[in-house]
Amino acid sequence: VLGSRGSVIPLFRKQIEAGGPVTVTDPEMTRYFMTIPEASQLVLQAGAMGNGGEVFLLDMGEPVKIVDLAKNMIRLSGFEPDKDIRIEFTGLRPGEKLYEELLTAEEGTNTTTHKKIFEAALEDVNQEWLSREIDRFESCKSDLDVINVLQDIVPTYHPNHNV
């Protein structure tokens, strides 16, 4: 959300004011951006639509390359990227992703009465299976046991190696 705590824009602004460099994680990194008023309005509208138990997804628009955002902010500040102010690539930190993964219609979302709010098509959870998996977690004796159970349940899970 633009202007929120943790947003990259205030960081880039400070780095530009200091003469650089502007730090970008990776040249291919993308993120979605939305203004605080737009995000607030959509969250409130989704809340008003809900009856309980639904999962709503917001249309975040198109992803923006962070390096393009950095270059545009440098230009808008009256400088030339990589000439007046350098862009430095810092590399991914543990757990950080190049892009945000959002559900799409093909992956199970349904339209709602609002064109920017979608509802996730959730499958019923097998209560027997869930109970068994909770028991497995409760019997874990170490962090490594927890990681192993998680990897069994979620094959795409890759732990942070600092754990």
Write out the residue ranges for each language-model feature.
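Strand-loop microenvironment adjacent to phosphate/nucleotide-handling motifs in alpha/beta enzyme folds
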Residues: 1-163
